[in-house]
């Protein structure tokens, strides 16, 4: 396609493409241009609202990986994620900014998505039901199964009289039969024992189906699975009694269970045996040769215990003497030889009396042989001990053993314990108040302990708390420790790791039971997060010199007037600091991988815990205020350190640099705040994290209603910072009303920042805010303005704030949305409280002056004008784009041509596509349309060119068309085609058929007459007219002040045409062509000369 034709195509289609580009630019402007985010640092902007969590014992604010920019990019809102780890009451979340505050109770549904204790009237956040099978081996002679249930996480001292705990129903399934039992949780410990009487037929071997092989007898017994469900109690607080046995066959019992009821929870397995097996013996080894064995059990008065004595098979001793000493309450009543053919056993009577020690001499016979015996040792004799009634019950009786060999060689003393009790104990169970320990002692040095109580269970199901004679031992003291009295487990900060289901063993008499706990430890090293690690001087911002501030020593090349004035020095940038970590534990299974408290993508904000142990290594270079704000002091490099409270170990380090380079404040973002709304939502990435979204209300609804402002500053190095973190004494904000009829400004000396009050209805950019340095550092009477910003105001009386403002956005998706608008509240606190660094904003780590920690809100992007440094648009209101349509609705601010915004400007975005997707699709559509137009024009041109190929003979007989070329030196062009003929026949653009291609390619205009029935018609008038008749082009036109060439084609007409041909260029002289070439390129001019010469030759 030749260049002239391409120009023609562009001439026709450029309006369409320009319109599409303009439409696309408006879409992208309303949706938000993602590239504008690059003007900011990694720290997102947000409404600097303060969050506090009340009524919670342990709570943390969170950070999810790679989600801060997506969730906090709006000056109007702030999203924060938090975790309620431990609480005995419903927590309350408070959000405050300036004089406005709002509270919201965190509902239990968000903290407990699936609560098995929904039937109780108590707050059961940390409750966890634990089941203990007292005996997993069940014999036909005693076909009873007992399961102890208790609640972990329930405060034992916080018991109310009207507390209603749920009932538990236990199920045992074997083949097609079911047995059930029930109990109700009660008491301070919240426990109960459920009993099941198994059917005797269950102890027989499993039924063999025809055609299958008979199953081999399992040595571990026949397994039976146990399950339980949770149910509400009756009107009287009792559980519904169920039949212990069911004779009819039920398919695994499921047909008898209400499917709509609570689901079955697995307890574990038990094993059934038909007969008692020989009980296992415990061994008390006296030395390498002799050992005492006994059966661990509880005995009563009159019971006789037998102690077998064995000797190693490889022992070379042929003679030894065993001494057994007892105290009151125990009597040795007999000794008998177990292998009389091998050993000769005799009891000496060296001592007399009822409780005299027994001396037993064993002599190996010469002809004896122990080859018939099996095992590493064989039994020599048995000693019978009778138990008498002790004075105090329960009691522990001791039997002391010692072996003597010829030559006065003796062994160490060995002690056997005999437990005497009138009760028939079947098990002991250690109960812990909590199921987990969060080891914050590593961070704070304060011990974290969990109370433990040990209870015994008798054969009839009676539960008794054991206060004495309990022994305990931790399986790994690098993870968890236990007190000497076995009444609590604890961590003191000296632990090395965490672990899932770490075991602490508790023993009472011959019974023992493990306590499993999960210990979470902070992952080291900790992560120190600083919003800006390179702090610069701020050009033009002078602050008074105090003892803690020193001027930079490397600024000698700068003018002294620039660096300081009247005892002032340049301000250094401030940064925000917080400390994050993950709580982890070694998994219980093999592999050694780490388990996370919330997940590998979540970090916990622990700034408040380690605030007292965080310091700057060189305080002269930088200063840390409140553990959350870092202020540059002097040029240099230093580190932020977190020290261990128990040792000299450094838990974390972060390098900070204070530079000599100066930065300037390039923009001041202003957000109007007339009130706050608060909503809560469950995190989709974790069932324990909760998102809180605080949104600033913007609408002024009644006369004299007051509003506060929130400001962010942007520096030339790209960093953005909320103005709240700077000391209010180092600057002042001056607000000016641009329309005092609509809003007025109060500048009360007691208040740090100006207050805006509504007067009459109106809207627009009505307030200008100036950031001015402190008065003591002004070098002249003219105030030094650091930055200027504008605020968009909308005043509409009597209108609900829900419709016009994005602050009343509704959440979609799972979760609960609760809102409380306080836009009509008047300030109830002095402004210096919320503006000063000593105020409530920086009191704790819940303040979170960092990247946002939460879900999605509207994103507000400060946009720059062309040729300006300002990040605000012409309307000075922020363009919003949604960042996540599933968790927060998108509201788009479409710009108006007149620079104003009506009440319907905020439009709901499609919930199906994201903003980036819509923008990309629009761009793709424009490109596709442009390609389609190009192809259509190519085909059209090819068809026209094919039809224009006429025989050479016909060309000779045709007269040539002649073009009149005119040049205008004026800067005005015709704006429209009003001077052209309006009829359809006279508005046709075509190429004269009287020329061949070589000639027609030099026609620089296609405005020719249209041929109808072989007759050619010319235009009604010439295109170029005298300058007096021309219509002036607007001075702002992009084509103004340029020379324009306009060509008009006049074609030959038939001889009978009433208008003669005039101004034929064929008859023009060569001098007439020269003026045409004044503004053409040399090559184009030469081609025009050649063309004219050919025309002369043809003539």
Swiss-Prot record:
Expressed in mature oligodendrocytes. Detected in the brain, lung, pancreas and testis. Highly expressed in mature neurons of the adult nervous system. The keyword Glycoprotein applies. Residues 937-1099 are cytoplasmic. Residues 1-30 form the signal peptide. Residues 797-858 are annotated as: Disordered. It comes from the Eukaryota. It holds the Pfam family Ig_TMEM132_2nd. InterPro entries: Ig_TMEM132_2nd, Ig_TMEM132_5th, Ig_TMEM132_6th, TMEM132, TMEM132_3rd, TMEM132_C, TMEM132_M, TMEM132_N. Interacts (via C-terminus) with NCKAP. This is Transmembrane protein 132D. It comes from Homo sapiens. The lineage of its organism: Eukaryota, Metazoa, Chordata, Craniata, Vertebrata. The gene is TMEM132D.
């Amino acid at each position: 396609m030749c260049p002239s034709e391409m120009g023609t195509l562009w001439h026709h289609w450029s309006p369409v493409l320009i319109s599409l580009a303009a439409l696309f630019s408006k879409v992208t402007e309303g949706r938000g241009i993602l590239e504008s985010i690059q003007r900011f640092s990694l720290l997102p902007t947000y409404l600097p609202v303060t969050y506090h969590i009340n009524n919670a014992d342990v709570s943390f604010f969170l950070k999810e990986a790679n989600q801060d920019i997506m969730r906090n990019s709006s000056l109007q809102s702030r999203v924060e994620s938090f975790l309620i780890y431990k609480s005995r009451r419903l927590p309350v979340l408070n959000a405050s900014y300036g004089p406005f505050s709002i509270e919201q109770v965190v509902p239990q549904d968000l903290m407990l998505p699936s609560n098995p204790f929904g039937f109780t009237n108590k707050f059961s956040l940390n409750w966890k039901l634990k089941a203990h099978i007292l005996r997993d081996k069940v014999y036909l002679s005693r076909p009873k199964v007992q399961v102890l249930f208790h609640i972990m996480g329930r405060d034992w001292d916080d018991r109310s009289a009207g507390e209603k705990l749920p009932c538990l129903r236990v199920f045992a399934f074997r083949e097609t039969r079911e047995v059930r039992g029930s109990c109700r949780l009660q008491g301070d410990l919240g426990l109960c024992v459920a009993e099941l009487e198994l059917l005797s037929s269950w102890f027989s071997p499993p039924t063999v189906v025809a055609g299958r092989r008979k199953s081999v007898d399992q040595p571990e017994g026949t397994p039976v699975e146990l399950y339980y469900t949770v149910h509400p109690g009756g009107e009287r607080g009792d559980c519904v009694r169920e039949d212990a046995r069911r004779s009819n066959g039920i398919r695994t019992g499921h047909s008898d269970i209400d499917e709509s009821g609570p689901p079955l929870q697995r307890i574990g397995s038990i094993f059934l045996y038909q007969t008692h097996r020989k009980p296992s013996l415990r061994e008390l080894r006296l030395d390498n040769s002799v050992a005492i064995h006994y059966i661990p059990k509880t005995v009563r008065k009159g019971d006789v215990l037998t102690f077998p004595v064995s000797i190693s098979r490889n022992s070379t001793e042929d003679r030894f003497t065993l001494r057994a000493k007892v105290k009151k309450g125990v009597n040795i009543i007999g000794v008998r030889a177990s292998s009389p053919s091998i050993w000769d056993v005799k009891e000496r009577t060296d001592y007399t009396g009822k409780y005299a020690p027994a001396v037993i001499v064993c002599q190996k016979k010469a002809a004896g042989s122990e080859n018939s015996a099996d095992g590493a040792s064989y039994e020599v004799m048995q000693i019978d001990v009778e138990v008498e009634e002790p004075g105090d019950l329960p009691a522990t009786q001791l039997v002391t053993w010692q072996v003597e060999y010829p030559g006065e060689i003796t062994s160490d003393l060995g002690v056997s314990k005999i437990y005497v009790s009138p009760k028939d104990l079947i098990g002991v169970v250690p109960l812990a108040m909590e199921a987990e320990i969060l080891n914050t002692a590593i961070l704070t040095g304060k011990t974290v302990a969990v109370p433990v109580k040990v209870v015994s269970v008798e054969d009839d199901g009676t539960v008794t708390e054991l206060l004495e004679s309990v022994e305990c031992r931790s399986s790994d003291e690098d993870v968890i420790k236990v007190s000497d009295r076995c009444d609590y487990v604890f961590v003191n900060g000296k632990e090395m790791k965490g672990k899932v289901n770490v075991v602490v063993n508790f023993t009472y008499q011959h019974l023992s039971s493990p306590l499993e706990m999960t210990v979470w430890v902070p992952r080291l090293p900790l992560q120190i997060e600083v919003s800006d690690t390179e702090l610069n001087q701020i050009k033009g911002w002078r602050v008074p010199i105090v003892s803690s501030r020193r001027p930079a020593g490397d600024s000698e090349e700068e003018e002294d007037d620039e660096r300081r004035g009247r005892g002032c020095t340049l301000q250094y940038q401030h940064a925000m600091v917080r400390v994050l970590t993950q709580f982890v534990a070694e998994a219980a299974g093999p592999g050694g991988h780490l388990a996370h408290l919330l997940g590998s993508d979540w970090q916990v904000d622990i700034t408040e815990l380690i605030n007292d142990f965080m310091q700057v290594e060189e305080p002269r270079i930088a200063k840390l205020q409140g553990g959350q704000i870092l202020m540059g002091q002097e040029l240099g490099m230093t580190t932020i350190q977190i020290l261990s409270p128990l040792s000299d170990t450094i838990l974390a380090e972060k390098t900070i640099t204070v530079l000599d380079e100066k930065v300037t404040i390039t923009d001041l973002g202003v957000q109007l705040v007339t009130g706050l709304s608060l909503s809560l939502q469950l995190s989709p990435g974790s069932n324990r994290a909760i998102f809180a979204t605080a949104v600033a209300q913007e609408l002024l609804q009644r006369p004299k209603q007051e509003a506060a402002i929130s400001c962010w500053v942007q520096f030339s190095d790209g960093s953005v910072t909320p103005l709240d973190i700077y000391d209010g004494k180092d600057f002042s904000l001056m607000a000016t009303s641009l329309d005092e009829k609509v809003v007025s400004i109060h500048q009360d000396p007691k208040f740090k920042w100006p207050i805006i009050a509504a007067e009459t209805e109106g809207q627009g950019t009505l307030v200008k805010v100036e950031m001015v340095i402190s008065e003591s550092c002004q070098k002249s009477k003219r105030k030094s303005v650091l930055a200027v910003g504008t605020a968009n105001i909308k005043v509409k009386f009597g209108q609900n704030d829900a419709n016009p403002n994005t602050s009343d956005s509704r959440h979609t998706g799972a979760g609960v949305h609760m809102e409380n608008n306080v836009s009509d509240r008047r300030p109830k606190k002095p402004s210096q409280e919320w503006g000063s660094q000593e105020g409530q904003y920086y009191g704790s780590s819940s303040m979170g002056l960092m990247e946002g920690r939460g879900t999605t809100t509207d994103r507000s992007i400060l946009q720059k004008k062309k040729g300006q440094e300002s990040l605000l648009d012409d309307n000075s209101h922020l363009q919003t784009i949604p960042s996540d349509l599933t968790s927060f609705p998108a509201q788009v601010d479409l710009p108006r041509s007149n620079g104003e915004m009506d009440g319907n400007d905020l439009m709901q975005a499609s919930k199906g596509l994201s903003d980036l997707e819509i923008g990309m699709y629009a761009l793709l559509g424009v490109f596709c349309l442009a390609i389609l137009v190009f192809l259509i024009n190519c085909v059209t041109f090819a068809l026209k060119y094919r039809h224009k190929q006429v025989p050479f003979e016909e060309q000779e007989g045709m007269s040539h068309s002649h073009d009149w070329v005119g040049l205008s030196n004026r800067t005005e062009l015709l704006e429209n085609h009003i001077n052209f003929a309006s009829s359809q026949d006279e508005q046709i653009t075509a190429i004269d058929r009287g020329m061949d291609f070589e000639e027609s390619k030099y026609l620089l205009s296609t405005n020719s007459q249209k041929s109808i029935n072989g007759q050619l018609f010319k235009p009604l008038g010439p295109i170029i007219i005298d300058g007096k008749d021309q219509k002036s082009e607007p001075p702002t036109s992009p084509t103004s002040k340029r020379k324009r060439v306009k060509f008009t084609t006049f074609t030959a007409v038939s001889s009978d045409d009433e208008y003669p041909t005039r101004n034929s260029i064929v008859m023009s002289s060569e001098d007439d062509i020269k003026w045409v070439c004044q503004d053409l390129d040399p090559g184009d001019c030469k081609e025009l000369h050649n063309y004219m010469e050919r025309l002369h030759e043809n003539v």
